[in-house]
């Protein structure tokens, strides 16, 4: 089993979780191929983390299965934009931590 972790990525955790659920339990090679055609920013990020987890384990992507793909919320960057009458309203810029575990596929299947 090998792991990869990407922290403080400027990405909404809610939107990233939608993509993470899609690849859980998939073959790593198939997961990377399917993420390539998704239009989301999260798809590109998660694809890189899966590739990193496969490389960390020293196995081929065709022999690896995504055991878990988890997206946790990181700190929220708060910025302010000026509004009318001297006021300011906050802009929230959420960050995420992406965690991927990859296991080698059993040979008997």
UniProtKB/Swiss-Prot annotation:
The SS bond pairs are none
Q: Name one GO molecular function term.
A: rRNA binding
InterPro entries in alphabetical order: Ribosomal_uL22 (IPR001063), Ribosomal_uL22_bac/chlpt-type (IPR005727), Ribosomal_uL22_bac/org-type (IPR047867), Ribosomal_uL22_CS (IPR018260), Ribosomal_uL22_sf (IPR036394)
GO CC terms = cytosolic large ribosomal subunit
- One Pfam family for this entry, by name? Ribosomal_L22
Keyword annotations from UniProtKB, A to Z: Ribonucleoprotein, Ribosomal protein, RNA-binding, rRNA-binding
Q: Which GO terms describe its biological process?
A: translation
Work out whether the entry's keyword set contains Membrane.
no
**NCBIfam families assigned to the protein according to its UniProt record, in alphabetical order:** rplV_bact (TIGR01044)
Q: Per its database record, what is this protein's job? A: This protein binds specifically to 23S rRNA; its binding is stimulated by other ribosomal proteins, e.g. L4, L17, and L20. It is important during the early stages of 50S assembly. It makes multiple contacts with different domains of the 23S rRNA in the assembled 50S subunit and ribosome.
Q: Which family does it belong to?
A: Belongs to the universal ribosomal protein uL22 family.
Summarize subunit and interaction data from the UniProt record for this chain. Part of the 50S ribosomal subunit.
Record protein name field: Large ribosomal subunit protein uL22
Question: From what organism does this protein derive?
Answer: Wolinella succinogenes (strain ATCC 29543 / DSM 1740 / CCUG 13145 / JCM 31913 / LMG 7466 / NCTC 11488 / FDC 602W)
| Gene assigned in the entry | rplV
